[in-house]
């Protein structure tokens, strides 16, 4: 059975997010990181001590612009070691320049830089595919190029960032994802993360035909009210437990 995770929502106190995750049988929580550092409720500083105090599994999701890797990968390594993490998710963005072949080459070099720092510490790096809102590491060709040049890089597949079912199949064929981001969306909206069942994604088809017997990690990227998260978890568990047709 896959491990199911939820978000540690930074607008809530960490102790409340911990209680919610534990009460609803989540296996871990995802922590947000960007160029400000770890993002948790301001009343929970020092964040490292707060996270370690509750002794609940977590994983960091780092949103990094392509010009921020050299500054933040060493900072992330320090945090990962303090939290005893062996996995890191990077969500690449590009806010400061046009996205073209040269930009993709910069991303490739930054990934190699990150791998060279993280791998000696036994830390696996996962790169997340993007939506068309910030179209870098989005298309099949871009994703194929990055993975073909970085054998040690792992794939986090964000299902809410796909264009359609064919796009999803192509991405799975390039690199089997060991982690999934799960949320629903309407395909005519450029970027959405809705509760499961509130959009157009056919998760039953995905887990019966495209990712049958999936056994990796699944993170519900849903920040709505608690009931939406719980209902989404129940639906995904039902899809995972439905016999393949």
Spans of features found by a protein language model:
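Alpha-helix-loop-beta-strand connector modules within alpha/beta enzyme cores
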Residues: 47-61, 110-118, 146-150, 203-208
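Hydrophobic "anchor" residues on beta-strands that sit immediately upstream
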Residues: 26, 30, 57, 124, ...
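Well-ordered, non-membrane alpha-helical segments in soluble/globular domains
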Residues: 43-47, 72-74, 104-112, 199, ...
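N-terminal pre-domain/capping segments
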Residues: 1-81, 245
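Alpha-helix N-cap/loop-to-helix initiation residues
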Residues: 14, 37-40, 66-69, 96, ...
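Active-site acidic/histidine proton-transfer and metal-coordination neighborhood
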Residues: 22, 67-157, 232
């Amino acid at each position: 059975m896959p491990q199911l995770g939820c978000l540690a929502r930074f607008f809530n106190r960490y102790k409340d997010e911990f209680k919610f995750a534990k009460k609803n049988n989540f296996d871990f929580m995802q922590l947000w990181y960007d160029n400000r550092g770890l993002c948790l409720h301001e009343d929970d500083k020092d964040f490292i001590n707060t996270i370690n105090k509750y002794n609940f599994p977590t994983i960091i999701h780092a949103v990094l612009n392509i010009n921020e890797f050299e500054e933040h990968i060493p900072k992330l390594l320090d945090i990962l070691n303090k939290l005893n993490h062996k996995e890191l998710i990077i969500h690449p963005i590009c806010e400061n320049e046009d996205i073209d072949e040269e930009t993709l080459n910069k991303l490739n070099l930054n990934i190699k830089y990150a791998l060279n720092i993280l791998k000696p510490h036994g830390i696996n790096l996962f790169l997340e595919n993007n939506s068309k809102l910030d179209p870098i590491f989005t298309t099949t060709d871009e994703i194929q190029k990055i993975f073909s040049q970085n054998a040690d890089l792992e794939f986090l597949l964000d299902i809410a960032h796909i264009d359609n079912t064919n796009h999803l199949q192509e991405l799975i064929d390039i690199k089997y994802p060991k982690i999934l981001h799960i949320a629903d969306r309407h395909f005519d909206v450029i970027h959405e993360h809705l509760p499961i069942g509130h959009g157009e994604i056919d998760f039953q088809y995905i887990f019966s035909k495209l990712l049958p017997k999936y056994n990796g990690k699944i993170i519900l990227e849903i920040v709505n009210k608690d009931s939406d998260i719980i209902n989404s978890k129940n639906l995904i568990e039902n899809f995972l437990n439905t016999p393949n047709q």
